[in-house]
Amino acid sequence: HVKQQTPDKPYIFSQLPDRSICAPAELQELFRSNSSTSISIHLSGGKLLRGVITEKIERSPGITSINIKLSDYPGALFNLSSYTQPGQSPVIKGRIIHPQAGDVLVLSLENDQYLLQKKAQKFFMTE
């Protein structure tokens, strides 16, 4: 009996930088947009993420989530959540995931900058 190795999934975000800084104002603008709005997000190196907001949900007061279908990566979904505490700036977290891809992009706040970083999906736990 031979244990089969799961084949590694292809990396579909290879043309994007490993780390990109995203403008907070641009990310916050996404949460002021409505469903079916076309959006674009500027990344380091002059790269752009383009897509359409497919869903916007207020999960509870101070927590809003949006889903964006990325037009340049069919099947990829950019899920973003904004967490707002009274008297503080909102904190945005997110991830871009594709079920057939081996790579994931994770958005997090580090040292007052929003970073979109590439990670291997097999090391990434979905929440």
Located regions from the model:
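N-terminal prosegments of processed precursors
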Residues: H1-E127
